[in-house]
Every structure is written in C-alpha cells, then in structure tokens.
Amino acid sequence: TPLSADDCEVPFYKDIHLSAGNGFSDDIEDYNGYKLRFSKSTLRRHGINPADVVCVCADGDSMEPVFPDGATLGINTADKVIKDGKIYAVNHGGLLRTKILQKLPDNKIRIKSYNSEAYPDEEADADEINIIGRVFWWSVIV
C-alpha cells in the first residue's frame, strides 16, 4: 500500500544480535528490511522525530503485565536522558534489555522490571549501561 503524506515507515528489527558499541547502529547488527508505519503528525505531536524511531520485539516476561514476551516496542533513539520511572531499551553488558530506569546518587542507575517478584531490582554504574532510547509505544496481540 502506498504511503500517505502523513505516513512514515520505520525499521523493525525483528531478529537482533547485540555487539559492543556506543549507539543503536553500533549495537544492532541485524536489520532484516522489515518496516512498520506510523503517523508523522502523531509522532511530532509527542516530540518524536520519525527518523529517530526504531521498533524491536520484547524478549522475556520481565515487563509483564504491561507488555508480554513478543510485544512490538517503539523506541525513540533520540531520547536517552533518564526520566525516573520511564521505560528504556538499553545495552547492559551486551544484552538488549527493556527496563524501567531510575537515577541514583553516585552515578548509579536502578534497573527495574514490572514483574518484580521474578526479576528483583538491580543497580549498575551509569557507565555500564548504554541507553538506546526510550520506549514510547508498544503493541500486543492478546
């Protein structure tokens, strides 16, 4: 289907493999050519540049019940400054993780999951975590 003037297509990294690096393009090695569509005006209304959006699949149950394993996540790769309680995609020790982040004293970060019974809070030095971007959207088929 042709794109309307208000539509944009963003990369959908369905199968990803992380490598060591400092930014999303360095962290993600596999791009399969898939794309998802978003409304440009909706993204702009929320302060998101369409060129900064990528989508990935959630892996695991640590963020249930908010989003389950396999949910599709929209990430704003330009939004890397931690706002306490927001959800971010991060490269932590070579693992792509989707977690709630909270700033702590002494350059530490608390890493939280919604499924906190199975995944207790963690702490890490800020320099151990590469923030890929803030999760601004997700889609789930129930």
Predicted features, each with a name:
Residues 71-72, 86:
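Structural motif
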Residues 50-55, 83-88, 110:
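Short, hydrophobic/aromatic-rich segments at coil-to-beta transitions
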Residues 85-97, 103-107:
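Short, compositionally biased
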Residues 62-66, 78-81, 126:
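Short, surface-exposed secondary-structure edge patches
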Residues 113-142:
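Amphipathic alpha-helical interface segments
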Residues 1-69, 132, 137-142:
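Short, positionally conserved secondary-structure boundary motifs
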